[in-house]
Design a protein with these regions (language model features):
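Conserved donor-binding/catalytic loop of nucleotide-activated donor transferases
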Residues: 656, 673-685, 702
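Acidic, glycine-centered active-site loop in nucleotide-sugar glycosyltransferases
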Residues: 678, 694-706
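Nucleotide-sugar-dependent
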Residues: 493, 661-670, 684-693
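Alpha-helical solenoid repeat scaffolds of the TPR/TPR-like class and their adjacent stem/linker regions
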Residues: 1-576, 594, 629-633, 644-656, ...
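Residues at the starts of beta-strands that form the adenosine-phosphate
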Residues: 435, 605-607
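Short hydrophobic "strand-cap" motifs at the C-terminus of beta-strands
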Residues: 409, 582-584, 611
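Glycosyltransferase donor-sugar binding loop
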Residues: 440-445, 608-622
Length: 782
């Protein structure tokens, strides 16, 4: 309204209605009012603004700009109009336009506090924190006691990395607002950023029961614990915050995330679904929910959440990595490699993604051990530390060492199958001669892990959680611990720290148990194995030198298994033969499926029992059904069982007569579990790779050489032969368990003694300055 012009109540009322419609996103109503009044030549700024918004909604930026610029030429525009226009743009996340409006607002009225405040807010939203701080500073001159402004200024300082200034802003509010959660968490956040974390935690803990919104305080405490890998504490704080306010979104997300990380997946899914209802646009929540579905074996359901995560953020590389895991687990190696490839392309520095790709190659039907070796060397070229950056001096004098320090590093200390191979050996170490250090990369805090960790703690002199250490910090820790021989138990499996080991933090470094192939690293000196698993003539498949030790392997079943009896083969009672494979689907290739289908063809009325992720059909089951259809085998001859706890799984082994080993990646612990339950299996040895010969190695050790074959045709023939000679398998049933208990579960002392002799050879060679070379067994150890 021009200065001096008579106030027109009807026009102002119409303008007020149009503005209200705009704010409520009722754009058609606003446009109708604006058009009607503009025809009457009522050039009120609000009507012109409404027409410019019309152009914006139609995507005509040129027309919008033309109409919008007319506003700034009107002398009748009031500072409140500019403020209202700015608020509209702010609500629609058009902060660039909001800044134009708020700037015009404070130019017309320099002492308009709200204009400076909102100008600062929009500039903040644009990420221009220095300019935002300037706007807030101007507003604070006008209203120095404004709590909201001081908090906003503090946020700007933290965004700029000026944590001391931010702390000063927040602390200035404490005398008047000692229990305001926004003030308290602001103070604590700045303290944390200033490396005064203990002060922050103590500050938040004090008077938390008096805090106005304690869920915010608990959320920050949970976040601190989470970032320090203290997952139990993180869960405790998040749970308390959730109890106090189940609708507070940050704590809801944190609670679900902590539950998932601690393998409490069912509750995690429930909580994260609630978070998604409140915020359907956060890719991280979809990702974490997918992780929990994957954690309970619901791979297809997990995939849906990963896809939704990627819809929201097409470069969310973690989702691609986990999609790769899911496809690999279900046996779709092609899609797994594709997903890992995308993840690696998005983040070339993530060596763990590259390790996942390497592990997947082992499952590939057409790949060779040479393919894996070449890719492992590529991993070294891309991720390992250059030779000139390796540790050059160690903090000990070899001549003064009286007791060897052995370091074991793994991502699997806890309830993981690798531990059940390692623990029977580790329990036999001569503690007078060897000092044992453990480096745990992936804390496992579930109930089963807590139980087994009690045993693990007894076999070591020092155990360190290194999951929060960088590669450089981990290297420094190992050097400071003066480790003489470092034994990696992970290889390229999850949780490995091979990049840290490429620094060569110990003078002797070896790979053992966890990975059935080479690491590909020159910094790893030895690969510890048995001669019939990896003979010397396969040395070209390893960058490491081979260190042969005695026995077959050491492995024990989980507690409670001693109560599970081996029952007679069920073929007599059933009236038909039951074959089985309890390995994960990722090991079952299409060639494998077809061979099993042909066995069913040739053994009338026989059935095949499989472990699957879900009883309703998934991709793996559908592929198997299609294979059976193609062979003319009834689908009903497939018996599906879901994954179960270990003791039930052992009971289920009693329900079949003969195992069928997958190929080319053979079973390992599953095959040993079969022996424990008195079941044998047919195994195909196809090539030179370790993982292609695991089944043959175990069968030889158990005196079951007749079950080893060298072609798919012979694999089928041997299974058919076994079906016709069940009495032979029944005769061996109890012998297999007895041999397992004495030579495998009870073989830890023999294996450990041989391992220690090999370590002594390694140490002597190092002290004498001899080159690293193969270590072979003498006649006695064989």
């Amino acid at each position: 309204m021009k200065q001096g012009k008579k106030f027109n109540y009807k026009v102002e009322k119409a303008a007020e209605e149009a503005l209200q419609y705009l704010m409520n996103k009722q754009f058609d109503n606003a446009s109708e009012i604006a058009t009607k009044n503009l025809k009457k030549k009522h050039k009120h700024p609000v009507f012109l603004f409404a027409k410019s918004v019309d152009a914006l909604l139609q995507g005509d930026e040129t027309l919008f700009r033309s109409e919008f610029d007319k506003l700034f030429k009107l002398s009748s525009v009031r500072y409140t109009d500019y403020h209202n226009f700015g608020v509209f743009f702010q609500q629609h996340k058009l902060d660039v336009l909001a800044v134009e409006c708020f700037s015009a607002c404070v130019k017309l009225k320099q002492d308009f506090f709200e204009g400076h405040e909102q100008l600062g807010n929009s500039i903040f939203n644009l990420g221009e924190y220095e300019s935002a701080l300037g706007a807030y500073a101007t507003a604070l001159i006008l209203k120095p006691k404004s709590k909201e402004l001081v908090i906003s200024a503090g946020k700007c300082c933290t965004k700029l990395g000026h944590y001391s200034d931010g702390l000063e802003y927040y602390q200035s509010l404490l005398p008047d607002y000692p229990f305001d959660s926004n003030v308290r968490t602001g103070v604590a956040s700045c303290l944390i950023s200033l490396n005064r974390e203990s002060e922050a935690v103590a500050f938040l803990g004090k008077d938390i029961d008096k805090s106005y919104e304690p869920e915010k305080d608990y959320y920050l405490l949970s976040l601190v614990s989470y970032n320090n890998f203290k997952l139990d504490s993180a869960l405790k704080f998040a749970a308390k915050g959730h109890e106090l306010n189940p609708d507070y979104l940050p704590v809801l997300k944190m609670y679900g995330t902590c539950l998932g990380r601690l393998n409490i997946h069912s509750l995690a899914i429930d909580i994260l679904k609630k978070a998604i209802e409140k915020d359907p646009n956060d890719p991280e929540v979809f990702y974490n929910c997918g992780n929990s579905f994957q954690g309970i074996g619901e791979i297809d359901q997990a995939r849906e959440y990963y896809f939704e995560c990627l819809r929201l953020n097409s470069e969310y590389y973690l989702a691609f990595n986990n999609l790769g895991f899911g496809y690999s687990f279900q046996g779709d190696v092609g899609k797994a490699k594709e997903c890992y490839g995308i993840a690696i392309e998005l983040t070339p520095s993530r060596e763990d993604f590259h390790s996942n790709l390497l592990f997947t190659i082992l499952h590939e039907e057409k790949s060779s051990p040479e393919d894996h070796f070449r890719e492992a060397r590529v991993w070294q070229d891309k991720h390992a530390i250059p030779i000139d950056q390796r540790v050059k001096e160690y903090k000990f004098n070899p001549d003064e060492v009286k007791k060897l320090r052995i370091g074991y590093i793994s991502g699997d200390f806890g309830d993981h199958v690798a531990v059940y191979y390692w623990l029977p050996v580790a329990q036999q170490h001569d503690r007078d001669k060897y000092e044992i250090f453990l480096y745990s990369q992936k804390p496992r805090e579930d109930d089963f892990s807590k139980s087994i960790n009690v045993e693990i703690d007894k076999v070591c002199d020092q155990r360190r959680d290194v999951s929060g250490l960088s590669d450089e910090e981990l290297c420094e820790q190992i050097v400071d611990d003066q480790i003489h021989i470092l034994v990696d138990l992970s290889g390229h499996t999850a949780g490995n720290r091979l990049r840290a080991l490429s620094y060569k933090p110990a003078p002797i470094q070896t790979s053992y148990i966890g990975y059935p192939a080479t690491t590909g690293l020159d910094s790893m000196d030895y690969y510890i194995t048995q001669p019939f698993s990896v003979p010397l003539e396969h040395e070209d498949l390893f960058s490491e030198k081979l260190a042969h030790i005695a026995g077959c392997t050491s492995y024990r079943v989980r507690p409670g298994a001693e109560k599970i009896e081996s029952k007679e083969l069920p073929y007599k009672e059933n009236g038909f033969i039951t074959f089985a494979n309890f390995n994960r689907a990722g090991k079952v290739t299409s060639e494998c499926m077809r061979a099993w289908g042909q066995i069913l063809q040739q053994v009338p009325n026989s059935k095949l029992m499989l472990k699957v992720n879900r009883l309703d059909e998934d991709d793996f089951t559908n592929d198997f059904y299609e294979c059976l259809d193609d062979l003319g085998v009834e689908r009903g001859r497939l018996i599906l069982r879901t994954r179960s706890d270990f003791l039930l799984y052992l009971e289920e082994i009693n329900e079949f007569d003969l195992g069928l080993d997958p190929f080319p990646y053979n079973g390992a612990s599953t095959s040993l579990d079969l022996f424990y339950m008195g079941r044998s299996f047919v195994s195909l040895t196809k090539g030179r790779a370790f993982h292609e010969n695991i089944g043959a190695s175990l069968l030889k050790f158990f005196g079951q050489e007749e079950m080893i074959v060298s072609s798919v045709e012979k694999y089928i023939e041997r299974a058919v032969w076994a079906a016709n000679n069940m009495e032979v398998l029944e005769e061996d049933r109890l012998k297999l368990r007895s041999f397992f208990l004495t030579e495998v579960a009870g073989g830890g002392a023999k294996v450990c003694a041989s391992l220690e002799r090999a370590m002594d050879v390694m140490w002597k060679r190092y002290c004498d300055g001899d080159k690293v070379d193969h270590i072979t067994l003498d006649g006695i150890e064989r």
